[in-house]
Amino acid sequence: MTADTTAVSVVASATRLVAKVGSSLVTNEGRGLDRAAVAHWAAQIAALRQQGKQVVLVSSGAIAEGMARLGWRKRPSVMHELQAAAAVGQMGLCQAYEAAFAEHGLRTAQILLTHEDLADRHRYLNARSTLFALMRLGVVPIVNENDTVVTDEIRLGDNDTLGALVTNLIEADALVILTDQRGLYDSDPRKNPDAVFVAHAQAGDPELEAMAGGAGSGIGTGGMLTKILAAKRAAHSGAHTVIASGRERNVLTRLAQGECIGTELRAVLPVWSARKQWLADHLRLRGRVVLDAGAVRALLHEGKSLLPIGVIDVQGEFERGDVVACIDPQGAECARGLINYSSADTRRILRQPSSQIARILGSMTDPELMHRDNLVVI
């Protein structure tokens, strides 16, 4: 991790970017929308559009606006009440952005996504095509998770993750995560006066995640761990990430002019194909298979398929075609992919050569547990 005072922000050269705005930046301390703040973001994005940049906005704030409209002072804990607030608030959020962008002659579109939309390959491709069509038409897409219909089990999670998934979906050059923090520190600056600000690092650097997971670390406070993981996801499509304070004056336009603000996490990880991104990020894991050292070497260094002889344990229950994680002998995930046999059948054929599959199961659909075209190395 280094600081480079001569660097130019990656946003300056980006032609397509995703901007994620946290709820604290568009609401009055959680008490409904701050229309002036919404107008401010619209003005900055309009300026980026005049520079020829395509921008997709991922914006929080629907639940806070819904609570204000419903007269609720306390955030409900019941899922259906939260979903009701999101449904009411989404109307206000869209109206506010529509009015703000109209001041600059721009149209907006609402895109609500769920995990199931992105897990289904056809719906995933359709969402991708729709977003590309909107950008070609000069429309500013405003994306949020469809909180009204999702459950805890199928949530995408936080909007940092959603921002990264949308970044990969549209093959954006950069992801800008705007928050109420300056960026990343090597420890919590509120507790450690000697905390060092991290201006530049590599997305996916294990040191960042180690700091985030360490005891007493502030880097995970305020959702910074989710931002680090979002940057790692975005890097697999070649997108750089900037984590910056939305309190900075005209932060988006200054980034676009090349000024380095906040923490920049550069993409140096191997770029995955669109299909492998879909496999890694959009399909829910259904189980795990533990591999021996030889199988791990074959997957990671030789680009081979996973054979049953290399599996030493099966964890969880899954069916043919589900996404299953491959775990190395130390317990770390090394790959994931679409499995060709159910968990029950996999348990019967593990540690066996492929030539024995038909004898054990009565037939053989595939000689591999996972074909190399249907797996991605993590």
UniProtKB/Swiss-Prot annotation:
Q: Could you provide one GO biological process annotation from this protein's UniProt record?
A: L-proline biosynthetic process
Q: In which pathway does it act?
A: Amino-acid biosynthesis; L-proline biosynthesis; L-glutamate 5-semialdehyde from L-glutamate: step 1/2
Query: Quick one: which residues bind substrate?
Result: S60, D147, N159
The answer to whether keyword Cell wall biogenesis/degradation applies is no
Xref: Pfam families: AA_kinase, PUA
- State its Enzyme Commission number(s): 2.7.2.11
What's its catalytic activity? L-glutamate + ATP = L-glutamyl 5-phosphate + ADP
Residues covered by the PUA domain: 286-364
Q: What class of enzyme is it?
A: transferase
What's the superkingdom here?
A: Bacteria
Per the record, the major location class is cytoplasm
Which residues participate in ATP binding?
K20, T179, D180, T221, G222, G223, M224, L225, T226, K227
GO cellular component terms? cytosol
Keyword field = Amino-acid biosynthesis, ATP-binding, Cytoplasm, Kinase, Nucleotide-binding, Proline biosynthesis, Transferase
Alphabetized GO MF terms: ATP binding; glutamate 5-kinase activity; RNA binding
Family affiliation: Belongs to the glutamate 5-kinase family.
Give a short account of what the protein does.
Catalyzes the transfer of a phosphate group to glutamate to form L-glutamate 5-phosphate.
Mind telling me what this protein is named? Glutamate 5-kinase
Q: Which organism is it from?
A: Bordetella petrii (strain ATCC BAA-461 / DSM 12804 / CCUG 43448)
Q: What's the encoding gene here?
A: proB
